[in-house]
């Protein structure tokens, strides 16, 4: 890249740096970018740069593949119902060990390596995420049946004061999706859904979902079929038609939830693309799929 092109890239970012100055951006960190060392580095660099140019990033991370590996090592078979992990007491201990004990610390360390002041938290920290047991239903033979997911929860409320205090002091909160109720019961939370709830609660400008796909596509195997922009009503129709299916549905539902709670836009991007977070935030064309209100 010659000097003129480098300068052009920097100049292109200027209006977006101004536009998002002091704004909160929630990043749901998941997928391949969590296990690939090179991807871990460029995601960390992206987030630290956001902080240094005046944005307020908040990370909430998943860890499904690593939880599955840990369960298999301990002789437990992962079980899912509608994309949610069935979580008995032993599974909950594994989830906490992996999310809080390993992944969260790894992310904090990586951000620190590149100059970021990161603080690792779980939803239990200062009652950051108050939760309740999730009631789940399935349709079986045209009958609605309640199923027990165990220690799976859903968000009741977010302690926004704690997040705001950290952001005011220029820290980057890194949050594990573990919730707690008033009786000190602990719950495993879907990270996508928790990210949407947090984004809405703290009045984030953007929610960025880091995934393993380029965005929402007609054909998952054909990147040219990507939708650059969608609205809430459009994604609803796409779910009904089966265009959006499987594990993408909870992500889209989390996106819609965030938008309905006041987030301006949600972006589904591919974490396998180098510096995809910066490309989304600081370029005119952006990257991935953007979803907005109608």
Curated annotation (Swiss-Prot):
Family: Belongs to the acetylglutamate kinase family. ArgB subfamily.
Reaction equations catalysed: N-acetyl-L-glutamate + ATP = N-acetyl-L-glutamyl 5-phosphate + ADP
Any one GO biological process: arginine biosynthetic process via ornithine
Pathway annotation: Amino-acid biosynthesis; L-arginine biosynthesis; N(2)-acetyl-L-ornithine from L-glutamate: step 2/4
Record GO cellular component, one term: cytoplasm
Keyword flag Amino-acid biosynthesis: yes
Protein task: Catalyzes the ATP-dependent phosphorylation of N-acetyl-L-glutamate.
Plastid among keywords: no
InterPro entries referenced in this protein's UniProt entry, alphabetically: AceGlu_kinase-like_sf, AcgluKinase_fam, ArgB, Asp/Glu/Uridylate_kinase, NAGK-C
Taxonomy, superkingdom: Archaea
HAMAP family reported in the protein's UniProt record: ArgB (MF_00082)
Name of protein: Acetylglutamate kinase
Keywords assigned by UniProt, alphabetized: Amino-acid biosynthesis, Arginine biosynthesis, ATP-binding, Cytoplasm, Kinase, Nucleotide-binding, Transferase
E.C. code: 2.7.2.8
Top-level class of the enzyme under EC nomenclature: transferase
Localization, UniProt: Cytoplasm
Cited Gene3D superfamilies: Acetylglutamate kinase-like (3.40.1160.10)
UniProt-listed CDD domains: AAK_NAGK-C
Binding sites annotated in the UniProt record for substrate: 63-64, 85, 188
Site (Transition state stabilizer) location in chain: 28, 251
């Amino acid at each position: 890249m010659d000097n003129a092109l480098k300068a052009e890239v920097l100049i292109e970012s200027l209006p977006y740096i101004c536009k998002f100055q002091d704004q909160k951006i929630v990043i749901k960190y998941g997928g391949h970018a969590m296990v690939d060392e090179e991807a871990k580095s460029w995601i960390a660099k992206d987030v630290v740069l956001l902080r240094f140019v005046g944005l307020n990033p908040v990370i909430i991370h998943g860890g499904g593949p690593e939880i599955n590996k840990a369960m298999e090592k301990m002789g437990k078979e992962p079980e899912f119902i509608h994309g949610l992990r069935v979580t008995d007491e032993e599974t909950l201990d594994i989830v906490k060990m992996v999310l809080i004990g390993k992944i969260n610390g790894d992310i904090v360390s990586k951000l620190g390596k590149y100059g970021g002041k990161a603080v690792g938290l779980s939803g239990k920290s200062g009652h950051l995420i108050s939760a309740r047991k999730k009631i789940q239903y399935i349709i079986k033979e045209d009958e609605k049946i309640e199923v027990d997911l165990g220690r799976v929860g859903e968000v009741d409320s977010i302690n926004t004061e704690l997040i705001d205090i950290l952001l005011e002091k220029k820290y980057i909160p890194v949050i594990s999706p573990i919730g707690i109720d008033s009786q000190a019961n602990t719950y495993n939370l879907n990270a996508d859904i928790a990210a949407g709830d947090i984004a809405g609660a703290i009045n984030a400008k953007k929610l960025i979902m880091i995934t393993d796909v380029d965005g929402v596509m007609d054909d998952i195997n054909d990147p040219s079929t990507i939708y650059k922009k969608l609205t809430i009503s459009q994604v609803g129709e796409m779910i009904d038609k089966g265009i959006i299916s499987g594990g993408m549905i909870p992500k889209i539902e989390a996106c819609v939830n965030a938008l309905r709670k006041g987030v301006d836009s949600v972006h589904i991007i591919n974490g396998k693309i180098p510096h995809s977070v910066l490309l989304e935030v600081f370029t005119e064309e952006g990257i991935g799929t953007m979803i907005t209100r109608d």
